[in-house]
């Protein structure tokens, strides 16, 4: 008896999924992909450029856009109050949406573009050369560190956010080397501080 019940219930479950799937859609399925984010149009709302996706959909497929706006309209009607705009939009802006890094914000350049070179004494007659400010010219510090180490045949390391320490006294040569390698760094933006204590 127990085996008969489980078999019949198992057959019903399998039959239900097949029947419901056939009723909902025609096979083969035709999926509409967004021209902006390349996802199906149902998933565009989870991307950072929702406005661009909606504009593309409205321009290329106005009837699909109308279906989407009709589906979303009950949510918006509940958020509208008298004398105010839609509250739902404000709440959407406050909440973080999933999917991607979001919109990339441009960094504001408030730091003046200046490269400073200083000679710092170590032990006895040994010196290190400190180069600061290369990052303000959008120069990769790791690449610059490798270049200095290879050019001067010495050790070099990135120590701070915008600081490279080169083992040895290269204050005379380094100005010319920087201008050869990175022409965007002009002579006026390089300042030699001379010998500086730690």
From Swiss-Prot:
Phosphoserine modified-residue sites: 20, 73, 189
SUI1 domain: residues covered: 115-182
Listed GO CC annotations: cytoplasm
N-acetylalanine modification, residue list: 2
InterPro entries membership: DENR/SUI1_TIF, DENR_C, DENR_eukaryotes, DENR_N, SUI1, SUI1_dom_sf
GO terms for MF: translation initiation factor activity
Localization (cell): Cytoplasm
Biased composition (Basic residues): 95-109
GO terms under biological process: formation of translation preinitiation complex; IRES-dependent viral translational initiation; ribosome disassembly
CDD domains with a match to the protein in the record: DENR_C
PROSITE patterns: SUI1
One Pfam family here: DENR_N
Composition bias, Polar residues: 72-81
Region (Disordered): 72-109
Keyword Transcription set for record: no
Gene3D superfamilies named in the record: SUI1-like domain
The entry's keywords: Acetylation, Cytoplasm, Initiation factor, Phosphoprotein, Protein biosynthesis
PANTHER family on file: DENSITY-REGULATED PROTEIN, DENSITY-REGULATED PROTEIN HOMOLOG
Protein task: Translation regulator forming a complex with MCTS1 to promote translation reinitiation. Translation reinitiation is the process where the small ribosomal subunit remains attached to the mRNA following termination of translation of a regulatory upstream ORF (uORF), and resume scanning on the same mRNA molecule to initiate translation of a downstream ORF, usually the main ORF (mORF). The MCTS1/DENR complex is pivotal to two linked mechanisms essential for translation reinitiation.
Subunit field text: Interacts with MCTS1 (via PUA domain); the complex regulates translation reinitiation.
Family from the record: Belongs to the DENR family.
Protein name (record): Density-regulated protein
Species the sequence originates in: Mus musculus
Gene name tied to this protein: Denr
């Amino acid at each position: 008896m127990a085996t008969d019940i489980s078999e019949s219930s198992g057959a019903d479950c399998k039959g239900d999924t097949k029947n419901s799937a056939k009723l909902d859609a025609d096979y083969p399925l035709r999926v509409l992909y967004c021209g902006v984010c390349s996802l199906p149009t149902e998933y565009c709302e989870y991307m950072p450029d929702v406005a661009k996706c909606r504009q593309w959909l409205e321009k290329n497929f106005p009837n699909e856009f109308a279906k989407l706006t009709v589906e979303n309209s009950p949510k918006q009607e509940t958020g509208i109050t008298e004398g105010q705009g839609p509250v739902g939009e404000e709440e959407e802006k406050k909440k973080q949406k999933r999917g991607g890094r979001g919109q990339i914000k441009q960094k504001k350049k408030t730091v003046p573009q200046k490269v400073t070179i200083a000679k710092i004494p170590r032990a006895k007659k040994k010196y290190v050369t400190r180069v600061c400010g290369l990052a303000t010219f959008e120069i990769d510090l790791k690449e610059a560190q490798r270049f200095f180490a290879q050019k001067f045949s010495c050790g070099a390391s990135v120590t701070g956010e915008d600081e490279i320490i080169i083992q040895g006294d290269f204050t005379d040569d380094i100005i010319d080397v920087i201008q050869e390698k990175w022409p965007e760094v002009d002579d006026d933006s390089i300042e030699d501080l001379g010998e500086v204590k730690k």
